[in-house]
Amino acid sequence: MQQIQRDIAQALQVQPPFQSEADVQAQIARRIAFIQQCLKDAGLKTLVLGISGGVDSLTAGLLAQRAVEQLREQTGDQAYRFIAVRLPYQVQQDEADAQASLATIRADEEQTVNIGPSVKALAEQLEALEGLEPAKSDFVIGNIKARIRMVAQYAIAGARGGLVIGTDHAAEAVMGFFTKFGDGACDLAPLSGLAKHQVRALARALGAPENLVEKIPTADLEDLRPGHPDEASHGVTYAEIDAFLHGQPLREEAARVIVDTYHKTQHKRELPKAP
């Protein structure tokens, strides 16, 4: 099992555990520089990111805002901007957390796009949903929500000449816990390679309030299971996932779940197949 852990960690470019606050600050600096270089390479000056109220988008948003602020200071070009986007489906259960995230990030610009009408309009036109059991239909519509959010972010980025930031990190990547061509679609993923507790460490160091740093993670895509915790979907805890990624001991059953899920979701981490 240890060899499998090492192979998967290498494939996901998992970063080693932080040993000190200096390690955390080094990762923050590295990832801000990465964001800045992505903008320079693309010849663009705008970043777009959906803010959900969870620690992942909060952390990515804090990094993005710092990146453009530093670029403005370094270059004197005030055109560098970060647009934080709220993408609620009707009324979001944890909207207060989303608003607290926005207040923490203090993005250059905030936009809100309620995806409810678009999701409902599309669902009503899909004959494939007819006759499905409620749980299956709810799951499919949940993925529609994630993909409509992607469409909205890319529309804003296209209109404003920007790049879309993703929030994927190693603990989600290993479980394939994202919607293919939904929240998995982005131009840059500045949290890539980090375990979940490392994302929290970055958030904490960037000044995020503790209640948001330690908030129970939820994708919150299904109407029939609002606020359903990620860990309940995984069947393992983030602590166990992080331990697996860092080659540390964990329950045999938990390790088996992670490995099986990793292989089952491999298609999500690959480019489309071609002949």
UniProtKB/Swiss-Prot annotation:
ATP binds at G50, I51, S52, G53, G54, V55, D56, S57, T167, K196, T218. Pfam families: NAD_synthase. Deamido-NAD(+) binds at R147, K180, D187, H267, K268. Its EC number is 6.3.1.5. Disulfide bonds: none annotated. One of its GO terms (biological process) is NAD biosynthetic process. Mg(2+) binds at D56, E172. It is an enzyme of class 6 (ligase). It comes from the Bacteria. SUPFAM superfamilies: Adenine nucleotide alpha hydrolases-like. It catalyses: deamido-NAD(+) + NH4(+) + ATP = AMP + diphosphate + NAD(+) + H(+). InterPro entries: NAD/GMP_synthase (IPR022310), NAD_synthase (IPR003694), NH(3)-dep_NAD(+)_synth (IPR022926), Rossmann-like_a/b/a_fold (IPR014729). GO terms for molecular function: ATP binding; glutaminase activity; metal ion binding; NAD+ synthase (glutamine-hydrolyzing) activity; NAD+ synthase activity. The keyword Metal-binding applies. Keywords: ATP-binding, Ligase, Magnesium, Metal-binding, NAD, Nucleotide-binding. GO terms for cellular component: cytoplasm. Pathway: Cofactor biosynthesis; NAD(+) biosynthesis; NAD(+) from deamido-NAD(+) (ammonia route): step 1/1. Belongs to the NAD synthetase family. Catalyzes the ATP-dependent amidation of deamido-NAD to form NAD. Uses ammonia as a nitrogen source. Homodimer. This is NH(3)-dependent NAD(+) synthetase. It comes from Pseudomonas aeruginosa (strain UCBPP-PA14). The gene is nadE.
